[in-house]
Amino acid sequence: MEQTYQYAWIIPFLPLPVPMLIGLGLLLFPTATKSLRRMWAFQSVFLLSIVMILSMNLSIQQINSSSVYQYVWSWIINNDFSLEFGYLIDPLTSIMSILITTVGIMVLIYSDNYMSHDHGYLRFFAYMSFFSTSMLGLVTSSNLIQIYIFWELVGVCSYLLIGFWFTRPVAAKACQKAFVTNRVGDFGLLLGILGFYWITGSFEFSDLFQIFNNLISNNEVNFLFVTLCAILLFAGAIAKSAQFPLHVWLPDAMEGPTPISALIHAATMVAAGIFLVARLMPLFIVIPHIMNFISLIGIITVFLGATLALAQKDIKRGLAYSTMSQLGYMMLALGMGSYRSALFHLITHAYSKALLFLGSGSVIHSMETLVGYCPKKSQNMVLMGGLTKHVPITKNSFLLGTLSLCGIPPLACFWSKDEILNDSWLYSPIFGIIAWSTAGLTAFYMCRIYLLTFEGHLNVHFQNYSGKSNTPFYSISLWGKEGSKISNKNFRLLTLLKMNKNARPSFFSNRVYKIDENVRNRIQPFLSIPHFGNTKTYSYPYESDNTMLFPILVLILFTLFVGFLGIPFTQDVDILSKWLTPSINLLHKNSNNLIDWYEFSKDAFFSVSIASFGIFIAFFLYKPVYSTFQNLDFLNAFVKMGPNRIFYDKIKNAIYDWSYNRGYIDAFYGRFLTAGMRKLADFAHFFDRRIIDAIPNGVGLMSFFLAEVIKSVGGGRISSYLFFYFSYVAIFLLIYYFFNL
C-alpha cells in the first residue's frame, strides 16, 4: 500500500504527454501529425485509463483503511520562508480522481467521432488532455498555493475550450465572458489565500487547519477579518461553480463543442468550486456565520437556476441552467454541514448530467443533417420533436438521465437529492420549502426538454425557421400558449424533398457549406453522410455511430447503479460512508448512517410525489396535439375560464419573460456594471490625455512659443545679433559699476 501512495504523484502528469507531443509534432512533422491524427484519441484514452486504474486502486485502499497520505517536498528559499509542494491522498481526492477519469474517458471516446470532421481535431484533444491534467493536479494538491496554480490552469483550459471555435464571434465573446467572470472570483480566492497565510503563516492544509483552530479556540484572531478572508475564499468557488451572482458565464459556455459541455458540467470546472469548499470545510465550520452564508448562496442558486431553465429553447442552455441548480443543491448541503450528501450528489449528478449532455450531442449531431451546421438551429428544441423513432437509443438514454435528474427511484440522483431535501428540513423550514419546490420545477423543465425533443412530430418540416416567423405544427406553443395550426391540411413531407428536376444533378453535387459558423469549410454532398465508404442521403435524423453510442451506454450503467453506493443497508455495506470516513456531517453527528426505512419511505414518497406533479404539468403543457387531452377537449375547458384567463396569462407571460431573459441579470450587469466600467474607462482616458498629459505638453508648448518670440526679435541678421549682444554687455557693465560705487 505504501508503494502505491508513493507513486501517486504521477497521476496528474500521465495525460500531459499528449498535448506536448501534439505540439511538438505539429512543429516538426506537421503533415505526418495531421495525417495520423486519429491515433491521438487512442493515446489520450489509454493514458487516462491508466490514471483511472490507479485512482480505483487508491479508492479501494481508502475504503479498507480510511487513511490519509501526504507527501511533501520542501523548497527552501531562506531561513525564514520555505515553500512546499506535494500531493495529498484522502477520500475526497480519490472520489474526485475517479469522477474525472471515468467521465473524461467517456467524453474522449465520444469526441473521437463527434469531432472527426473538425479541422481542430488535434487542438481539441490537446486541450482536453491538458484539462484533465489541470483538474487532477487540483484535486491532489496539498496546499493552497498548488490549489491556486492548478485552479488558474483549469480556468485557462476552460477559456480555450469554450472558445474552441474562436472564429465565431459568439464563441469568442462567450469565452471572454467566462474568463472575466472567473477573474472576479479568482482574485477573491488569491486575497483569501494571502489573508489566511498572514493569519496562520502556512499554506499546508494540515498546518493551516490546526493553527487556525487553536487561534479560534484561544480567541486570538479578529473575527471580522477572518470572516472577510473566508468570504474571499468562497468567492472563488462561487465563480467556478456558477453560483449566484457569478453564474452568468455558464449558459454562454455552451458555445463550445458538446463534449466540452459534458466535461465542464460533469466532472471538471464546475466541480472545482464544490471541491474547494469541501476541502476547506474544516476552516469554514469554525467561523461564525460563514456556513449560513454558504447555504444561503446555495439555496438562491437552486431556485434561480430552476426558474431560468423553464423557458429555454436551446437544449444545451436548458441543461446548463439545470447544472447551475444542481450545483446549488451541493453548495446548500455543504453550507448545512451535510458533507456526505453533498459529495454523494456530486457523484450521481456528474454521471447523469454527462449522460444528458452526450445524449443532447447525439441529437444535435442528427439534426445537423436537416438544418445544417448552425447551433442556433441544430440546438433549437422548436425544430425538434418526433425523434423517438429516428434515434431510439439516444431517446431511451436521455429519458433515463431525465428521470434520474427528476429524482425518480431507483436512478442515481434520487438517492442523493433525497438526502439533501431531508437535511434541508432539519436545517431550516424555509430552505426546505424552497428546496422541495425546486425539485418539482426540476422535474417540470427536464420533462419539458425531453418532450420537446423526442415526442410529437419533427417540427423542422413544419416550420419556417428563418427566425422571422414560425408556423408551429402544435396547437400549444413552447410555453403552453395557443398557437396557430398548419393551414395547409394537404401538406406532405415529400414536398420538402422535391427539387427542380432539371437541377437535380446540382442537388447532389459537391458544394461548400459553412460548418458551425466557425469558418470550417467542408466539401460534401447536400444532406449526405459518408459511412464506411458509402454515401447515404438522409431526409430525417439518424442514430449516431457506435463510437458515440458506447459512452452513452456506459453512462447509463453508472446512472442506474452508482446511487446504490450511498445506501446504508447495514454498517458493513455502507460503502460511501466508509469511503468518506472520517467525514464532517454537522446535521448527523451521532448518526450511525443506518437507514430508517419507515422515515425513508415517507420522505421518498413525498419527494417522488412532487417530482411526479412536475412531470404531469409538463405532459399537460407539452404533450403533442394528437393526445388524449386534445381528443377530449380537455385543454379547451381551461381556455374558457372567463375573466381570470387574462390574469393567468399575465402571470404566465411574466414567468416566461423572467426565464427567457435570464432573470434580467445579464441585462443588469450589461447596463450598470459593463456600461459603468466603460464610462469610468472613458473618464480615465480623458483625465490622462487632457489633464495628466496636459502638464508636460503645456510646458513644451510654452517653451516653443517663447523661443518663437525670441527668434522673431532677432530677425535673422548678424548685425542685429551683434547690436543686441553689445547692448546687453553694456547694460550689465553699467549695473555692475552702479552697485560697486
From Swiss-Prot:
Record key words, sorted: Chloroplast, Membrane, NAD, NADP, Plastid, Plastoquinone, Quinone, Thylakoid, Translocase, Transmembrane, Transmembrane helix, Transport
Gene Ontology CC annotation, any one: chloroplast thylakoid membrane
Domain of life: Eukaryota
UniProt entry tagged with the keyword Thylakoid: yes
Keyword Zinc included in the entry's annotation: no
Transmembrane segments: 9-29, 40-60, 89-109, 125-145, 147-167, 185-205, 219-239, 258-278, 283-303, 327-347, 354-374, 396-416, 425-445, 549-569, 605-625, 721-741
Subcellular location as annotated: Plastid, Chloroplast thylakoid membrane
GO molecular function: NADH dehydrogenase (ubiquinone) activity; quinone binding
Biological process, per Gene Ontology: ATP synthesis coupled electron transport; electron transport coupled proton transport
Chain segments annotated as coiled-coil in the UniProt record: none
Reaction(s) catalysed by this chain's protein: a plastoquinone + NADH + (n+1) H(+)(in) = a plastoquinol + NAD(+) + n H(+)(out); a plastoquinone + NADPH + (n+1) H(+)(in) = a plastoquinol + NADP(+) + n H(+)(out)
Known EC number: 7.1.1.-
Membrane topology (UniProt): Multi-pass membrane protein
Pfam families: Proton_antipo_C, Proton_antipo_M, Proton_antipo_N
Main location: plastid
Signal peptide: none
Recorded family membership: Belongs to the complex I subunit 5 family.
NCBIfam families to which the protein is assigned, alphabetical: NDH_I_L, PRK06590.1
Subunit comment: NDH is composed of at least 16 different subunits, 5 of which are encoded in the nucleus.
Protein purpose: NDH shuttles electrons from NAD(P)H:plastoquinone, via FMN and iron-sulfur (Fe-S) centers, to quinones in the photosynthetic chain and possibly in a chloroplast respiratory chain. The immediate electron acceptor for the enzyme in this species is believed to be plastoquinone. Couples the redox reaction to proton translocation, and thus conserves the redox energy in a proton gradient.
Protein name: NAD(P)H-quinone oxidoreductase subunit 5, chloroplastic
Organism: Cichorium intybus (Chicory)
Gene designation per UniProt: ndhF
